[in-house]
């Protein structure tokens, strides 16, 4: 008699609308209960029985109950699940399989089965890709997942690579395809095969995409010719190879190996500027004035060159520093190194005064054995030969940025606008507390930004620099010319790595249109979005593989007295993160390892400091000695403690 009663339905509706609700993100704990985080200030307790309906990271709506003045949340509706597609490890066997997601906050096994069409017979320890199919807040009894892809077996030494690539849905190998003959592009190529072009790279590099040639002019000015590998001479726009490169967007460099953007026949052979091989190039010739500036008379043209020497960074650096035994093959090569060195110093000096120069940070290289085991991690400082190539590439990219801007009005530009305008006042206030006075308006201009950066570089430590980093905007890829504040340049468009960057291939096609005097369409915006997304995924993949290898490398140091110098890179409520100076590993030091009495300890992310009894004991950029307390292989995290 009540089922169709409109009064009862109205009463139910009223009760529902009057019940308090909140939307937020579920945060799990290791103790079974959780919290619904609504914003930075407000969170609600979720009791253990209710946590069984949700997963860490789910965005949900919950009913808020109040009992004895204590509020708790009862999950009611799912807005966005945390897990959709994920990787994990299989438990169980035969028809009773579960999968544990590979995530530090997700420990519960999810019942699963192989999806239709997946032939592999899964067993305990296998790595797999899964997709969530059921969720309790969607009216299902429990969580359930389909296994959509087998990755590898439990003890595969190369699991860090295969699992990471599968997690980010990235390619595992080079694209298929071969370019049989060069295209007829209607370009006249200058024959520069007689000139002493050289390449300078790591000794192991196969995909050499830049060769350099310098000469001194009669008036004492230096002329630099930068020849760049020419994959667009082989790959037609819109072809199968071009579309594959467009999707990949970049060569993916992971510790130990790379997954190229182009087929290896092209990247490591046909296009690579190998010594004593004739190769087509896109070439830029510029004149460096006495003060290091680049003359307006910039020439882009197609050419053929023959590199006369494959030089290695360390050999060239040793020779210039008068150390080591290596010698150039002949006086012609020696003369090139000397001239390129002069250009490097001249351009470096100009950038120091008129743009910005990055501080040199070492690169860390993993030395791997046959089975992917980490034999060593070597810090490779950026030496003078690295800087020769860097200065030449920056100069060439600056030339391309100018030419594309002036002749076409578009291109693929790297744009960085410095500080977010919304943060300008807060930035000025922070700097003022440290005795630096800046105008909030001026610091948003390229000149004002450069001026501040130079003042920060002159500080005795990098502490203040680290504090203002959060106010900076991110670099973007844009078809519109714009300044690059980070480099201190009015515009920056890369074209010097077309074997490994699709954006550089696009700029090659645009520059060729300029050379031929043809009109060409502006690149589509969705291409820049794809490049930005791929760059993000590749960086995450590199970091994930690195974390795994660092955990393997330092595992046997856990619990020992081995000391490592470590730079504090971040402070949070729970402790601080440090980077080991010798190998680049990042470790976490919990607050409990810093001081036993929690009430006497203040960890301030805002200030980048840790105070004990009101006194600053640690701050970001400090270098301290640490030991490794624990390595958690399941989460690839390293826990350190200050050395006694």
UniProtKB/Swiss-Prot annotation:
Any one GO MF annotation of this record: RNA binding
Domain RNB as annotated: residue spans: 189-516
Location within or outside the cell: Cytoplasm
Catalytic activity entry: Exonucleolytic cleavage in the 3'- to 5'-direction to yield nucleoside 5'-phosphates
SUPFAM superfamilies: Nucleic acid-binding proteins
The keyword Cytoplasm belongs to this UniProt entry's keyword annotation: yes
Gene3D superfamilies on file: 2.40.50.640, Nucleic acid-binding proteins
Listed Pfam families: OB_RNB, RNB, S1
Keyword Nuclease: yes
E.C. number: 3.1.13.1
Biological process annotations from GO: mRNA catabolic process
Gene Ontology cellular component annotations, sorted alphabetically: cytosol
S1 motif domain sequence ranges: 561-643
InterPro entries: CSD, NA-bd_OB-fold, RNase_B_OB_dom, RNase_II, RNase_II/R, RNase_II/R_CS, RNase_II/RNase_R, RNR_Ribonuclease
The protein's role, per its UniProt record: Involved in mRNA degradation. Hydrolyzes single-stranded polyribonucleotides processively in the 3' to 5' direction.
HAMAP family: RNase_II (MF_01036)
Protein family: Belongs to the RNR ribonuclease family. RNase II subfamily.
UniProt-listed NCBIfam families: 3_prime_RNase (TIGR00358), PRK05054.1 (NF003455), RNase_B (TIGR02062)
Protein name (Swiss-Prot/TrEMBL): Exoribonuclease 2
Annotated source species: Salmonella arizonae (strain ATCC BAA-731 / CDC346-86 / RSK2980)
């Amino acid at each position: 008699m009540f089922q169709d009663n409109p009064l009862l339905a109205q009463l139910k509706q009223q009760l529902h609308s009057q019940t308090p609700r909140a939307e937020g993100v579920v945060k799990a704990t290791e103790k079974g209960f959780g919290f619904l985080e609504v914003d930075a200030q407000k969170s609600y307790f979720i009791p253990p029985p209710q946590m069984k309906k949700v997963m860490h990271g789910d965005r949900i709506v919950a009913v808020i109950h109040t009992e004895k003045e204590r509020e708790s949340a009862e999950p009611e509706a799912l807005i966005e699940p945390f897990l959709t597609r994920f990787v994990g490890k299989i438990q169980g066997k035969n028809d009773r399989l579960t999968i544990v997601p590979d995530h530090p906050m997700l420990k519960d096994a999810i019942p699963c089965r192989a999806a239709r069409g997946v032939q592999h017979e899964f067993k305990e320890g296998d790595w797999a890709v899964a997709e969530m199919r059921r969720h309790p807040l969607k009216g299902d009894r429990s969580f359930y997942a389909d296994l959509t892809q087998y990755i590898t077996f439990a003890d595969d030494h190369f699991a860090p690579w295969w699992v990471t690539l599968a997690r980010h849905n990235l390619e595992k190998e080079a694209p298929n395809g071969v370019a049989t003959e060069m295209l007829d592009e209607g370009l006249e190529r200058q024959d520069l095969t007689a000139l002493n072009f050289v390449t300078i790279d790591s000794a192991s590099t196969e995909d050499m995409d830049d060769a350099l040639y310098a000469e001194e002019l009669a008036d004492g000015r230096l002329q630099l010719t930068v020849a760049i590998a020419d994959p667009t001479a082989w790959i037609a726009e819109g072809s199968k190879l071009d579309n594959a490169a467009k999707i990949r967007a970049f060569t993916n460099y992971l510790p130990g190996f790379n997954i190229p953007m182009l087929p290896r026949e092209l990247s490591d052979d046909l296009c690579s500027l190998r010594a004593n091989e004739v190769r087509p190039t896109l070439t830029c010739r510029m004149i460096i004035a006495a003060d290091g500036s680049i003359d307006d008379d910039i020439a882009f043209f197609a050419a053929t060159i023959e590199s006369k020497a494959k030089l290695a960074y360390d050999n060239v650096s040793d020779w210039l520093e008068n150390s080591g035994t290596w010698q150039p093959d002949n006086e012609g090569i020696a003369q090139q190194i000397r001239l390129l060195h002069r250009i490097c110093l001249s351009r470096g000096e100009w950038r120091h005064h008129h743009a910005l120069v990055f501080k040199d940070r070492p690169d860390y290289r993993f030395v791997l054995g046959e089975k992917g085991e980490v034999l060593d991690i070597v810090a490779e400082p950026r030496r003078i030969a690295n800087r020769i190539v860097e200065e030449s590439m920056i100069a060439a990219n600056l030339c391309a940025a100018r030419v594309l801007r002036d002749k076409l009005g578009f291109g693929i530009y790297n744009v960085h606008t410095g500080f977010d305008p919304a943060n300008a006042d807060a930035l000025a206030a922070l700097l003022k507390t440290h005795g630096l006075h800046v105008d909030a308006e001026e610091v948003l201009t390229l000149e004002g930004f450069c001026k501040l950066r130079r003042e920060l570089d002159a500080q005795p430590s990098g502490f203040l620099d680290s504090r203002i980093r959060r106010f900076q905007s991110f670099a973007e890829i844009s078809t519109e010319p714009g300044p690059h504040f980070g480099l201190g340049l009015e515009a920056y468009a890369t074209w010097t790595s077309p074997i490994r960057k699709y954006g550089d291939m696009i700029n090659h096609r645009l520059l060729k249109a300029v050379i031929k005097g043809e009109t060409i369409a502006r690149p589509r915006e969705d291409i820049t979005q794809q490049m930005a997304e791929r760059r993000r995924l590749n960086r995450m993949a590199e970091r994930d593989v690195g974390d795994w290898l660092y955990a393997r490398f330092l595992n046997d140091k856990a619990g020992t007295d081995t000391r490592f110098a470590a730079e504090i890179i971040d402070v949070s409520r729970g402790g601080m993160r440090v980077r080991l100076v010798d190998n680049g590993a990042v470790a976490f030091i919990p607050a409990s390892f810093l001081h036993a009495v929690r009430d006497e300890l203040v960890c301030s992310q805002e200030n980048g400091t840790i105070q004990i009894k009101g006194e600053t004991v640690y701050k970001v950029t400090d270098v301290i000695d640490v030991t490794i307390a624990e390595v958690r292989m399941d989460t690839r995290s390293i826990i350190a403690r200050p050395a006694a």
